[in-house]
Amino acid sequence: MTEPLIRVRGVSRAFPAGDEMVRVLKDVDLDIEAGEMMAIIGASGSGKSTLMNILGCLDRPTTGSYWIEGRETSKMAVDELAALRRERFGFIFQRYHLLGDLSAASNVEVPAIYAGRSRSDRHKRAISLLTRLGLAERTGNIPSKLSGGQQQRVSIARALMNGGEIILADEPTGALDTHSGAEVMKILRELHAEGHTIILVTHDKKIAEHADRVVEISDGVIISDERNVSRSTTARPIREHGPSAGWRGAIDRMTEALRMAGAAIWAHKMRSLLTMLGIIIGIASVAAISALGAGSQQQILSSISSLGTNTIEVRAGKGFGDLEAGKIRTLVPADAEALVNQPYVDSVTPTVTTSVTVKRAAVAVNASVTGVGADFFRVRGLELAHGQLFDAQDVIAYSQNVVIDASAARDLFPDRVNPVGQVILLGTMPARVVGVTKRENSFGPAVDTLTVYAPYTTVMGRMLGRPNVDGITVRIRDDVDPGNVEAAVTRLIERRHGAKDFFLTNSATIRETIETTTQTLTLLISSVAVISLIVGGIGVMNIMLVSVTERTKEIGVRVAVGARRSDILSQFLIEAVMVCLVGGLMGIMLALGISALFNLLSPDFKMIFSPGSIIVAFACSTLIGIVFGFLPARNAAKLDPIEALARD
């Protein structure tokens, strides 16, 4: 005796009702041979739909066993059941359950997507099936543009897409007029003649009369099993499905998931835009703050270079703010001369500073007069805009030749007279301007201080009358480690003074400190901006949860036609990631726009974007989509298909 296509033994199905379990099916035994056309008839609540759901692998029995071609379904995993639905079954629903935003052809193609068939192959078959069912002119119509009979024919074509060896038709004419219902039953009879196993579920005895076999069920028990005519032998249909095409099938499913996600986002444009808003603001904030931090760092480091390239500063006292430093007079020009001959030194300059009133004609301003050596301008990396520098001979001769900076030139010569060659008064001492330096990026609070550079001998001897200097600046050779030089300078000066009555500052150390500080501040401010990203991510999660609720029936249909849990999970996860990626792209564009405007309004201070920051922004967008999209996607993947299909 041959094994029946379907064998049901002792199947019961119970559902919880309060504290009790209600048995809807009770010890059902049923065999269905391949090629049969059978009707399951019963009143509402008789258990016929529950039995159909179990036969279609949409539900599992509470007790008993269900076999398909000798395979026990109760031991199958969720994805194995999905494979059975995809490869063996075709569903025809009373309410059609077509996806409203897809065309007739696209609706028919859905089962083949999950079977791994190529796009061109499934499209050709969809058109072929629709043409066969008289819908050649309606393949591009969405369901709302089709009549009830036409929608049911699309549903039949979808059931046949992967072969439809077993067709489960739940009240297939229940929502149709008499003429359309007759057409549908004619199609089902033709499919039966071709070898398809047809299982009708109906309450209408007239519909049941189309079947060769009628099984009546009441209160969960089969009460009769009769044949209208002797079952004719029919050839089994050729299966149109095949195994998924490995990685190509997976790529194709992923491509379709991307397309479907894009279509879902486009279908709710305003909602999607509002959902993206939090991501846009968050990404724009993080990117802009990062660019602002990079610009600040560059500006500060550029300003530090005004202290000299790779320099060490020697000053009297124990450190900045030492109240006793003014009483220490051991730091003298001879210390600078001793440093000049050291192998690690590029150039050296003593510095001594005082503040005086500087006059030129009717103009009087407060300015800083800095006494320096001839190498000062090399040490500090200052460049001339006009004129020339004073030299070593000027230093020896206590020359009254001076160089002024761009700010002093601007304020002392508002009439735009060339300062070179002009005489100014430093307090009561006349001095001749021989050069003007270019504007520099000053470091510290004295951004716009007026400065006059004079030979240190002139400032010490003619203006202050003291032998000591305020500090000595040493420019280190580029091929020498500043850390080793700092120790060598300390030993040399300490040996000369007999005590450590001075302290050193290293421009390299200052640079490192500034870099660390600006990075820390940027990170701190960015962490505040990240809050916006988190809020945006929560918004994405909320909207995706709403989307899952709204599309519950769609999920049920996809599961019924063979979608795996991973297919549903990936579809909704991709949708969440796509929302975040588009939001991230718009956020970066917004940040770039802000940067362009900022740089236009502030030419001296630039926001600087790096490729790394943009990559990080996109990575953040993707991560947010994955993290906050996972819960809604998982909920969608775990939906009960029976419950999903039952929702309006």
Curated annotation (Swiss-Prot):
The primary location reported for this protein is: membrane
For this UniProt entry, which segments traverse the membrane?
Answer: 273-293, 528-548, 572-592, 613-633
Keyword Flavoprotein annotated: no
Recorded hits in InterPro entries, A to Z, give: AAA+_ATPase (IPR003593), ABC3_permease_C (IPR003838), ABC_transporter-like_ATP-bd (IPR003439), ABC_transporter-like_CS (IPR017871), MacB-like_ATP-bd (IPR017911), MacB_PCD (IPR025857), Macrolide_Exporter_MacB (IPR050250), P-loop_NTPase (IPR027417)
> What is its membrane topology?
Multi-pass membrane protein
Indicate where this protein resides in the cell: Cell inner membrane
Keyword annotations from UniProtKB, A to Z? Antibiotic resistance, ATP-binding, Cell inner membrane, Cell membrane, Membrane, Nucleotide-binding, Plasmid, Translocase, Transmembrane, Transmembrane helix, Transport
Task: Provide the E.C. number(s) assigned to this enzyme.
Answer: 7.6.2.-
For this record, an example GO cellular component is: plasma membrane
Offer one example of a GO biological process linked to this entry: response to antibiotic
Tell me the GO molecular function terms: ATP binding; ATP hydrolysis activity; transmembrane transporter activity
Q: How does it assemble?
A: Homodimer.
What name does UniProt use for this protein?
A: Macrolide export ATP-binding/permease protein MacB
Natural source organism: Agrobacterium fabrum (strain C58 / ATCC 33970)
The upper taxonomy is: Bacteria, Pseudomonadati, Pseudomonadota, Alphaproteobacteria, Hyphomicrobiales
Q: Please state the gene responsible for encoding this protein.
A: macB
